[in-house]
């Protein structure tokens, strides 16, 4: 997808997280399955990643958005290492999922997402993200200046950054 939102760069910060929201909503509509989101944008089902999302901002402020949903893979399609962390809709639901229906639903959800982004009205998307974020209320590992640390994930801020509390009780926001 090559959306051209024509917005200032700072307004485009949440696009990757919003794409995760769109995937969750599309899967719910088509399959009835509620996905979780692992911050910042990994749709999760059955504790495993079900989708990959990549976003690139070009110099002209166009957004290149790539979304790959694991729809029909079976266990033989994943290497043992990948099978530990990834799954497919078919594997988790035990039935086939229409790729055409899912693609149509995803395009509709992305269209709604861009309308909300252009209007500056992300409150509903942020509330949904907070509801399905699997990191909130848990301890997370963060790589900061080459050093791993642990912190408690406590919230998602208005730009979809992860708000954490470190071992000393200090709050900070992590950006992807």
Positions of the model-derived regions?
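Short, acidic (Asp/Glu-rich) active-site segment that either coordinates a divalent metal cofactor
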Residues: 60-90
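Residue-level signal for pocket-adjacent positions within structured domains
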Residues: 38-39, 48, 73, 77, ...
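Glycine-rich, charge-dense phosphate/pyrophosphate-binding loop(s)
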Residues: 104-176
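Short, solvent-exposed amphipathic alpha-helical segments in soluble enzyme
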Residues: 10, 15, 80-82, 157, ...
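Structural beta-strand/beta-sheet cores of well-ordered domains, especially the beta-sheet scaffolds
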Residues: 41, 51, 67, 85-87, ...
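Contiguous, small/hydrophobic- and glycine-enriched helical/loop subdomains that border
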Residues: 1-62, 85-108, 112-119
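A short, well-structured catalytic beta-strand-centered motif of the EAL phosphodiesterase domain
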Residues: 53, 67-69, 152-154
